[in-house]
Amino acid sequence: MSAELIAVYKDEQIIDLESAKVLGLSDGIKALKGTEPIYFDDSPLALEVIRHSCAHLLAQSLKALYPDAKFFVGPVVEEGFYYDFKTTSKISEEDLPKIEAKMKEFAKSKLAITKETLTREQALERFKGDELKHAVMSKISGDIFGVYQQGEFEDLCKGPHLPNTRFLNHFKLTKLAGAYLGGDENNEMLIRIYGIAFATKEGLKDYLFQIEEAKKRDHRKLGVELGLFSFDDEIGAGLPLWLPKGARLRKRIEDLLSQALLLRGYEPVKGPEILKSDVWKISGHYDNYKENMYFTTIDEQEYGIKPMNCVGHIKVYQSALHSYRDLPLRFYEYGVVHRHEKSGVLHGLLRVREFTQDDAHIFCSFEQIQSEVSAILDFTHKIMQAFGFSYEMELSTRPAKSIGDDKVWEKATNALKEALKEHRIDYKIDEGGGAFYGPKIDIKITDALKRKWQCGTIQVDMNLPERFKLAFTNEYNHAEQPVMIHRAILGSFERFIAILSEHFGGNFPFFVAPTQIALIPINEEHHVFALKLKEALKKCDIFVEVLDKNDSLNKKVRLAEKQKIPMILVLGNEEVETEILSIRDREKQAQYKMPLKEFLNMVESKMQEVSF
């Protein structure tokens, strides 16, 4: 069955076997020219078809178990699929095994999955009395609708789908949640059930293993266990508190970045947290981003708390006159920004309302775009290499709605392409995915569990310089508008540290570990030596803790291991008398001895091994 054709890919669309019949192709799908065949396997395109059909299998099973159930939408998403529905019955996660069993029953029944097309009038009549399906239709333009049937179940859908439920053997329902109708919190709350499906048993098994591993590595769990950060309801949702160990980890990353930024010609700047709404109107944020901003009134004037740092950096640029000899100007700031996120999407440090960006803005001439982007790509590689991340790039080009001349866009896009080519970086192209004011490169990193995360962005901006009438004097003594490059490599420290925590499972590499060395004196008489060693290590810029509670040696060692501290030094009579240290090295997975001076030299060298 793995070799069976289930669909084809043509013109960025998946066309299933039933859709080919509806199109009136006498030879079915094989009559379509210029197509890429999609076979029943665990490839991305095949999984889209499989998971879409599994969503319908879920809905069919829900209808059988809860006859009054009504369904909204059941799309394929990054984590599998889901279906939003409502019923008068109370459903909890404890019901998922029962629902899953019914799905398996329908799958074994080998029900044919067929398609018909209806006019809008016919579809409204077919789903008469179903307000959720009417809500779906109200959001769809056009007057032709697809309806897929399997057994006694049918659903409004454009596809694609498998030809038969017999294909669906390897799936799992993963969780139950609430979801507002259409994502609007003013609407009624529906039930959402998530699931995952694969073509093969191995695909499902590997995925479920990854899910269990992800639970162990969940940064919210690690944040508590390792004392990195916390949240407090009295302070507010989405507003993290950095605890001492988390702040140490963050500061280490900030310091390494600052050193690299200064060496690369960036100047530190700092803008205010709140700015008059007048500037947000000039920038366009007031009209296009207002619902994500927080506002306050001071002396009868409206101010907006900044959701981005770009306007402040523009004002720094405008504080002086510039000639072409000054360019490029590179400003950076660890800028604290606030964005209103709905409470339902907040997620640990990954999605918060206050966060700090490793933000920079480069003001340059058009001719300097390629060299500046090339330097950013080099910088990005150094950072990702230091943390052991693999990454990929995606170039987003001009959208249908945009500003600027065609030649200017082409020149800017080609500059990004040439910079990527210069670094021999394979990249994907998102045609039409750029911002209305310029092309961009997105940086996506892959973690230890092979999950992809959107982090940094390199964005060429031809809009804000025009809105704020930025200028520099060119070599012909004429005023010329600079290009502005928005650049964040980590994205935000909060998000990056969340990803870093899950990537390493809390076992941070030595150079950024919140506690790098634990000193464990065996008895009280060894405490003085431990404090002396602590001071020596602090001079080497090492984060060190002395575990001197009145506990057994084994308990103190277990505590240090539980805290995932890279190096543990047990200090007893022999170590005090000989100054030869006993070291437990997590990274080397070894225990060894080393003279004190040699050890201090070693850790000092380890701290100098990593730079961006």
Swiss-Prot record:
Function: Catalyzes the attachment of threonine to tRNA(Thr) in a two-step reaction: L-threonine is first activated by ATP to form Thr-AMP and then transferred to the acceptor end of tRNA(Thr). Also edits incorrectly charged L-seryl-tRNA(Thr).
E.C. number: 6.1.1.3
GO function terms (MF aspect): ATP binding; metal ion binding; threonine-tRNA ligase activity; tRNA binding
Places the protein is found: Cytoplasm
Cofactor binding mode and count: Binds 1 zinc ion per subunit.
Residue numbers binding Zn(2+): C310, H361, H486
Assembly, per entry: Homodimer.
First-listed, main subcellular location of the protein, grouped into a coarse class: cytoplasm
Reaction equations catalysed: tRNA(Thr) + L-threonine + ATP = L-threonyl-tRNA(Thr) + AMP + diphosphate + H(+)
Biological-process GO terms, alphabetical: threonyl-tRNA aminoacylation
SMART domains: tRNA_SAD (SM00863)
Statement: the UniProt record of this protein carries the keyword Electron transport: no
Protein name (record): Threonine--tRNA ligase
Keyword Protein biosynthesis: yes
Organism lineage string: Bacteria, Pseudomonadati, Campylobacterota, Epsilonproteobacteria, Campylobacterales
Example of a GO cellular component annotation carried by this entry: cytosol
Family the entry assigns: Belongs to the class-II aminoacyl-tRNA synthetase family.
Location of region: Catalytic: 218-509
The entry's keywords: Aminoacyl-tRNA synthetase, ATP-binding, Cytoplasm, Ligase, Metal-binding, Nucleotide-binding, Protein biosynthesis, RNA-binding, tRNA-binding, Zinc
Disulfide bonds: none
